Design a protein with these regions (language model features):
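Catalytic cores of the polymerase beta-like nucleotidyltransferase superfamily
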Residues: 1-200
Length: 200
């Protein structure tokens, strides 16, 4: 199924404006699970910030290392994490993959995490926008785990279904079928890599 994402300006979702403070002073974009929590009226614990290039990542890393409002938490091959001293929110600067917003969302497994807040830059003009999957709100409301395209890391996706079950989410029939087919093609030698490099 082809992904045709919806794009809205940053005035469309007032409850997401709390993320504005985490969008400044870097070229990254926020995507993934925090939007699931925001639109479910729950407190989000962490924010994943992605980047188009390694240079953009390094610029953001330098900013947060020097920012007295943040404290370093941990670092691994996938990301570097900082915590805001005032809000206690954790931000993860993701470096496991560099690409644009739409390409990144296509790489996410479930429709309920295919949501991003980004800066659309056209010359000297910068607009803050949202991009999300057409069935994001429907699947979130119905607590459905839907793989609309494919999963690059099916074992990781399978593991994540257990996490979501604790919050009342369940896979639709088509997703179960698709995930079973994907798992059959997994090389046993790649299990560790699949779990480690999967996207949130």
């Amino acid at each position: 199924m082809e992904n045709k994402f919806i794009i809205k300006d940053n005035e469309s979702f007032f409850k997401c404006r709390k993320l504005d403070q985490y969008m400044s002073n870097h070229k990254g974009y926020i995507a993934g699970g925090c939007f699931k929590d925001i639109f479910s009226n729950k407190k989000f614990r962490d924010i994943d910030i992605f980047f188009e290039t390694p240079e953009d990542f390094n610029q953001a890393l330098d900013f947060y290392r020097k920012n007295e409002d943040y404290v370093f938490v941990y670092e691994n091959d996938n990301a570097v994490c900082f915590s805001n001293k005032n809000t206690k929110k954790k931000i993860e600067l993701v470096r496991s993959r560099f690409c644009g917003v739409e390409e990144m969302l296509k790489g996410f497994d479930f429709t309920i995490v295919k949501f991003a807040y980004y800066k659309a830059i056209d010359g000297d003009n910068t607009e803050w926008k949202y991009m999300y999957h057409p069935s994001f709100f429907e699947d979130l409301t119905n607590k459905k785990l839907v793989i609309d395209d494919t999963s690059s890391f099916p074992v990781n996706t399978f593991e994540r279904t257990y996490k979501y079950r604790k919050y009342g989410f369940g896979m639709c029939r088509e997703t179960k079928k698709k995930l079973i087919e994907l798992l059959q093609g997994v090389n046993i030698d790649d299990l560790g890599k699949d779990l480690y490099f999967g996207f949130d």
